[in-house]
Amino acid sequence: MTAIYILTMISKEFQKIWEGNQKVKIPKSKDPLKYRLVQAQYRVRSMVSRLDVYIGRMQERDKVLFERVVESQMSKDQSRAAMYANELAEIRKITKQLLTTQIALEQVSLRLETVTELGDIFANLIPVMGVINELKTSLKGVMPELSIELGELGEGLQEIVIEAGEFSGVSGISATYSPEARQILEEASVVAEQRMKEKFPSLPAAGITQQQKS
């Protein structure tokens, strides 16, 4: 089973479990801005919790594949060891991407909490929207359903920013990849890399092919 197939099956399973909870729409513009920010926070936390489950399942699969690499090497079946090692490398690549997404969303949640309590919506949400747009794009081929949900979240936040801009007399918004958004994602990637080193054992050298090193 490939890493993408495993992740797809996990996603379908938990989509059923979370049915009715995860499909909460960002309230329409008639609702107060603060209430809609709270709803956005809830939605982000839900994504973080689901990512925890996905990452846990990927760790389980990683453990199985790692053991198969070792067993194949012990039996001197290097071609099979390389096959398992390549799949293991793919699992870890996806897991790091999920960890980076989770850590970045944790930062988004904190920013939304700050905005909800202290205000200054227009200035503080622009970087958040940039982060969400980048995560949405990066997850399209890995977790399409989460990518779609991030797109919906981004649209809801864009409505909030537009309204906040109207109230403050500011016109025009940009959810581009701002320096602050870039910093959030870069820091998330660094933390994810560190967690990968802590959670996953190094691959046996003989099982690492040129494909894994690239």
Curated annotation (Swiss-Prot):
List S-S links within the chain. Answer: none
The consequence of inactivating this gene is:
Deletion mutant forms small colonies on selective plates. Forms enlarged cells, with a highly elevated content of DNA.
InterPro entries linked to this entry: Cell_Div_Machinery_Comp
What does the entry say induces or represses the expression of this protein?
Expression is highest in dividing cells.
Q: Which domain of life is it from?
A: Archaea
GO biological process: what's one of them?
cell division
* Keyword annotations of the record: Cell cycle, Cell division
**What the protein does?**
Part of a cell division machinery.
For this entry, the protein name equals Cell division protein B1
The organism of origin for this protein:
Sulfolobus acidocaldarius (strain ATCC 33909 / DSM 639 / JCM 8929 / NBRC 15157 / NCIMB 11770)
Source organism phylogeny: Archaea, Thermoproteota, Thermoprotei, Sulfolobales, Sulfolobaceae
